Amino acid sequence: MATFSQKPTEVVKKWVIIDAENLVLGRLAAFVANRLRGKHKATFTPHVDDGDNVIVINADKIVLTGKKYTDKKYYWHTGYIGGIKERTARQILEGRFPERVVEKAVERMIPRGPLGRRQLRNLHVYAGSQNPHAAQQPEALDVGALNRKNKRIA
């Protein structure tokens, strides 16, 4: 029996929607990263984008455990000398684009490179419960019910 290798033309992508309200950030991000990569499928092939399209709603209601809400820092550099900047998770979640916390967590769990960037384009994160993907008829996934540690009441 030969090893199965999925071809890009044979890929069938599903649309799934996940409600992130009261879900632990890291556990949600790990689940979403596996879905985006296609590792949940028996047809997983490392060099082919055969993951699902994932929609995450209510990203502003995510939960961080411990003191990460106030202590976790996100760094970036402007490119100028001494231009290192930082923001806490609290500042981002209470700011203009709270969905970026989820996007960044998932991005850091996907391998870097051309394939990783293509897989990341299949992630759609929204701060509220509204999303423009009703036409895709996404299947709802309850990540909180998979394991009791996935959900925390804030």
UniProtKB/Swiss-Prot annotation:
What does the UniProt keyword field contain? Ribonucleoprotein, Ribosomal protein
Question: Does this UniProt record's set of keywords contain Glycoprotein?
Answer: no
User: Could you confirm whether the keyword Cell wall biogenesis/degradation appears in this record?
Assistant: no
What biological-process terms (Gene Ontology) are attached? Answer: negative regulation of translation; translation
**GO MF annotation: an example:** structural constituent of ribosome
Q: List the GO terms this entry assigns under cellular component, sorted alphabetically.
A: cytosolic large ribosomal subunit
Pfam families assigned to the protein according to its UniProt record, in alphabetical order: Ribosomal_L13 (PF00572)
Q: Looking at the record's lineage, which domain of life comes first?
A: Bacteria
Q: InterPro entries, from UniProt?
A: Ribosomal_uL13, Ribosomal_uL13_bac-type, Ribosomal_uL13_sf
Coiled coil ranges (UniProt) are none
Role, per record:
This protein is one of the early assembly proteins of the 50S ribosomal subunit, although it is not seen to bind rRNA by itself. It is important during the early stages of 50S assembly.
The UniProt entry's sequence similarity note says: Belongs to the universal ribosomal protein uL13 family.
Q: How does it assemble?
A: Part of the 50S ribosomal subunit.
Would you tell me the protein name for this molecule? Large ribosomal subunit protein uL13
This protein's species is Bartonella quintana (strain Toulouse) (Rochalimaea quintana)
